Amino acid sequence: PIPTFYKRLQAGQGCFCSDTVRDFLDMSDFLELMDRVMDSGAPSGIYNISTGEGHTIKEIFDIVVSHLGLRLDEPVPIVPPGDDDVPAVVLDPSETERRLDWQAKIGFEETIRRMLAWYDEYGVTDVYSHLKAGLGQASRGE
């Protein structure tokens, strides 16, 4: 939802948030673990690579709104998860942390802010979503 929110809000278009929770991992943390595993001959197995922390889509929306300096004309609609969506996806990384001596270092807000800084510099071209276009309007804040 991050590039979708960014692009739509930049264009003054409305958005909505699905009432879902997700576990967001910074790619730097992921890649650091991949480098470590490939270089060390770590034990094989199935690992959850995650923070173990759940965050609502609305939390992301609020960070994007703040980053863009927007003032909403009305609250963003929160809609129930669609038939093809899952209410919550939060993984338990404890086995990964224990067996690979690894833990995510970059927090949720920092991860989102890094993505937004990248969008500020390079823009957002195409966005892909299984969700239908949303509601609500935003305007530039003072």
Model-derived features: positions:
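C-terminal substrate-binding subdomain of Rossmann-fold SDR/epimerase-dehydratase oxidoreductases
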Residues: 9-142
